[in-house]
A protein has these predicted regions:
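Membrane-embedded alpha-helical signal segments
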Residues: 4-82
Length: 82
């Protein structure tokens, strides 16, 4: 699994805990609903290698491939501990 610093970069890139409304995943994508898209920082998100970021309003999808379920669990765990 990815280290805590990489996972924190994803959280920070999404605008921090206070900007994240929900986290889910499909087969290959981390699906996140955020409050304010202006707080999105793709450079920070890209510190954890991915295959692309899809943005539609407040819905963000980050393509991680088959490891996405592990990444989702790591993001949720880190959010709970903040």
């Amino acid at each position: 699994m990815k280290n805590a610093a990489e996972v924190q970069c994803v959280i920070d890139g999404l605008g921090g805990k206070e900007n994240i409304l929900s986290v889910d995943n499909c087969f290959t994508r981390l699906r996140v609903n955020i409050k304010d898209p202006a707080k999105l920082n793709e450079e920070s998100i890209n510190r954890l290698p991915n295959s692309g970021i899809v943005k539609k309003g407040t819905d963000i999808q980050i393509v991680y491939g088959l490891q996405v379920a592990d990444i989702k669990r790591a993001v949720e765990a880190q959010l709970e501990n903040q």
